Amino acid sequence: MTESASCHGGGVCGGLAQEEGQRQVFCGLTSIVWLHRKMRDAFFLVVGSRTCAHLLQSAAGVMIFAEPRFATAVLGERDLAGMADCNEELDRVVHELLARRPEIRTLFLVGSCPSEVIKLDLGKAAERLTAAHEGRVRVLPYSGSGLETTFTQGEDQFLTTLAHELPASPEGAPSLIVLGTLADVVEDQFRRLFDQLGIGPVHFLPPRTGADLPPVGPGTRVLQAQPFTGEATRALIRRGAERLDAPYPLGVEGTRSWLQAATRSFGVPDEQLEAVIEAPIARAQAALERQRGVLSGKRITFLPDSQLELPLARFLSEECGMQPVEVATPYFDREFHGRERDALGEEVRLVEGQDVDAQLDRLRADRPDLTVCGLGLANPLEAEGLRTKWSIELVFSPIQGFEQAGDLAELFARPLVRHETLKV
């Protein structure tokens, strides 16, 4: 994050309090769990420790009926002590992997805390391996290290690497890139809406296969679908693209404004947009109405975890009648998150960063009806009588767009309904 994008140090900056201290977050390797499902001809090889391997195996434990598209090249004690040639062993592992999995077209070498501590140059390794397998596979490096990051930034690093690999578009050729991983069903819904609006060509990054990397250039518009794509967006801007300023497509109003940013950029009249989205909005409003009775008036606190906190709080406040007490986010980027912050108003306590002990003290004093937090904090808070929602579930679930608005609201209603059902 650049200095202009965020204030640094403790205190309050532009109405946003900042905290530094002990944190409770997953590292960027966790993003592989959803990225490997998206790019179907890619493979993610983590160069890390046994701890890295255990994290991925635990996070992706549901993948028991299919061979996953990720693995860990484990650095042993001799590697970490500098007593072995890591590059030679890495080459051997990659050669065996490609011989066993001939369908791989793009291989990502994913850096970890251990590989970065011993300064293993995965960039040079990727160049060497690409040359060794020329015409067979493209090898690309990126960092999934947990040093000073949160888990969704793993996707940002991944997308930034892809941004550098995109082909150049013809000078001035108009196109739209939707940036950030979306569930296939959501992607298909958005594509149909863009087709009905006459906007195109539309590309989604990341694509479903490495062969579908979109071109980028001066005529390209970028529409962020996820709030944790800041560095990738800047990389596309450096390639000549233009970012469209919009809220994130959560809920009816977020999705409408998100689509409107695209239609106005492409010269589509507002009347045409409203005609196209009238039916989806009606379905979304009906689905939301079923959840408002549970959510309206309830108080909610977000602990920092995924960077989805601000747009989720905006959706729950505007469309479900919830009252955000404190909304904390791991990183705040004024350029990309400012609209979402402004929508929450002055009465909501906003925090960037984490001092987990201080935040837990405030949480116990506030006693909100629902707390959105990481897995490691959920059970202890439940034991204290606080109802919780796992933040990582909101990253894995299809929540964007009109058709998912009711499902998104239901994700927050479930723990409240469960609590009332189990109350003695």
Curated annotation (Swiss-Prot):
One of its GO terms (biological process) is light-independent bacteriochlorophyll biosynthetic process. Pfam families: Oxidored_nitro. Binds 1 [4Fe-4S] cluster per heterodimer. The cluster is bound at the heterodimer interface by residues from both subunits. It catalyses: chlorophyllide a + oxidized 2[4Fe-4S]-[ferredoxin] + 2 ADP + 2 phosphate = protochlorophyllide a + reduced 2[4Fe-4S]-[ferredoxin] + 2 ATP + 2 H2O. [4Fe-4S] cluster binds at C27, C52, C113. Keywords: 4Fe-4S, ATP-binding, Bacteriochlorophyll biosynthesis, Chlorophyll biosynthesis, Iron, Iron-sulfur, Metal-binding, Nucleotide-binding, Oxidoreductase, Photosynthesis. GO terms for molecular function: 4 iron, 4 sulfur cluster binding; ATP binding; metal ion binding; oxidoreductase activity, acting on iron-sulfur proteins as donors; oxidoreductase activity, acting on the CH-CH group of donors, iron-sulfur protein as acceptor. It comes from the Bacteria. Pathway: Porphyrin-containing compound metabolism; bacteriochlorophyll biosynthesis (light-independent). Its cofactor is [4Fe-4S] cluster. Belongs to the BchN/ChlN family. Protochlorophyllide reductase is composed of three subunits; BchL, BchN and BchB. Forms a heterotetramer of two BchB and two BchN subunits. NCBIfam families: DPOR_bchN, PRK02842.1. This is Light-independent protochlorophyllide reductase subunit N. It comes from Halorhodospira halophila (strain DSM 244 / SL1). The gene is bchN.
